[in-house]
């Protein structure tokens, strides 16, 4: 029983098929039906036999003239496209109908007259193959040109990546292996199991030392402050470059949120344009007394030479005093070099070998416990102090005063031999000082 439906379009087409392993074209009579209460939208084709085309407009003369019927369901169509590269019969154009099951290559003298109604029935909501120019332009009249937002929802699109943990020293220590889900948050990277929403490890962006991707592997170096400890973590994924780019974008966004990180890095301090000038050692001058610094801040301007302070002579184990001390303090002046102070311990111990011929009684100490060998100018009493402005400025007068003190001390001890030695020593020193002509000065 023939169908009572009226086709939307019918006519002669050529359909490609395989015959003995070769591509061949055969003539078919095609009928295009629209969907309705009695059937679905479809394209039916019949083989044409023995040139049985009637004179009534390319229709078969009767049922006996028809061959095998083939049906293409338009609801299963995926695409309807022209096939310009295919070889087809003369004065025809080829077009390809692709369905969910297979593809059909057809040819017609006016292929566009077939493609447009097929597209209208197969894709009714799009209206891509609308034949009227007014219908095609009507939806475009109210269209406002707009651009795609490249960053819209980009964070959500690249938030989660399926990865496989690569074996490294850090992953072995953390007992990580197999597939995981790498989640990129706003502040950190989280590693989650595919079946559990809880994060196994998290690495804040500010604690990552390095990160990068190479040959399908995304890796980063974690710092000591991370929960997993420091080390290299590697994950293989076909979207490794996307993961690396997402991490770089997240770090850039986090840097913008922190004002202290957005500021320019601190510049080094400028070098000093000039340094304090130091004069050569030969040009150093003496500081005036009124500009003299505090004792804790005094700096030696010149080398005054060796000095020794007066010390209290204490007897050794054998009862003899240590060797004699001498101290000479000189002060260098810019104009004239003068002797500031000169003194010498002239006390000679006759009881000591090589200095005197005293007997053993000279080595015995007095009942008071203090050794008589110590000179009065070396003890800490106030009987003798450094010569100042109140004392005689004459050097000879100073030695006479020392002589009187020595004589008083020696007279109390009853040692005439010591007086003779002291006198001889003082005479020698006074004679030597008279020849030099010392200039009197005060002790600083």
From Swiss-Prot:
PTM annotation, UniProt: Constitutively tyrosine-phosphorylated.
Modified residues (Phosphoserine): 138, 274, 308, 314, 371
Entry annotated with the keyword Membrane: yes
Residues with Phosphotyrosine modification: 325
InterPro entries per record: Docking_Protein_DOK, Dok1/2/3_PTB, IRS_PTB, PH-like_dom_sf, PH_domain
Coiled-coil positions: none
SUPFAM superfamilies from the UniProt entry: PH domain-like
Self-association state and partner proteins as the record states: On tyrosine phosphorylation, interacts with CSK and INPP5D/SHIP1 via their SH2 domains. Binds ABL1 through the PTB domain and in a kinase-dependent manner. Does not interact with RasGAP.
Protein known as: Docking protein 3
Species the sequence originates in: Rattus norvegicus
